[in-house]
Design a protein with these regions (language model features):
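Glycine/threonine-rich phosphate-binding loop and adjacent beta-strand/alpha-helix elements that clamp
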Residues: 1-158
Length: 158
């Protein structure tokens, strides 16, 4: 783009047209792995008659998508990722909405195992969003990290 002349120039393609994508495409073999524990995804929706509120829970046990706890056999690394999503809200008050994610991530192999626990909650009022939570991390069962989160973000018309 040349603003002094208001000309917009694009390069011209000078190669040969392709037949299309290679329908015999090859890829590397899958990494050998073993499922150590089968996973599942539980889903529930509950309605509370007394508070006129709903709770929706999606709970990935042994994997975010239910893939289970698995080990990459060549290197011995084990992966476990559990993720629970919980949303609650009253029919009478949209500002009562509360969304919490509880996450556990374990990775490692013999002599080196990380374990992280993360909980984050989002709520709101008419002016702000609030994000609170914490993270704890351990290596080989020794606690090595903690952080608390507490943020307020203006809604700016949202």
């Amino acid at each position: 783009l040349d603003l002094s002349t208001a000309k917009f120039a694009l390069p011209m393609f000078s190669g040969k047209d392709a037949e299309g994508p290679n329908m015999e495409a090859r890829c590397a073999p899958l990494t050998p792995m073993t499922t150590l524990s089968p996973g599942r995804v539980d889903r529930t929706i509950e309605y509370d008659l007394l508070t006129d509120s709903w709770t929706s829970i999606t709970n990935g046990v042994g994997g975010v998508f239910g893939e289970g706890i698995y080990r990459f056999d060549d290197i011995g690394t084990v992966v476990e990722h559990n993720l629970k999503r919980e949303l609650t809200m009253s029919n009478k008050d949209p500002l009562s909405a509360k969304y919490t994610i509880t996450q556990k991530m374990k990775n490692g192999r013999d002599g080196w195992l990380t374990d992280c626990d993360i909980v984050v909650t989002q709520t709101a009022d008419k002016d702000n969003f609030y994000i609170t939570g914490h993270m704890d991390a351990s290596i080989n069962d020794e606690h090595v990290f903690h952080r608390d989160y507490d943020y307020k973000v203006k809604r700016n018309g949202i």
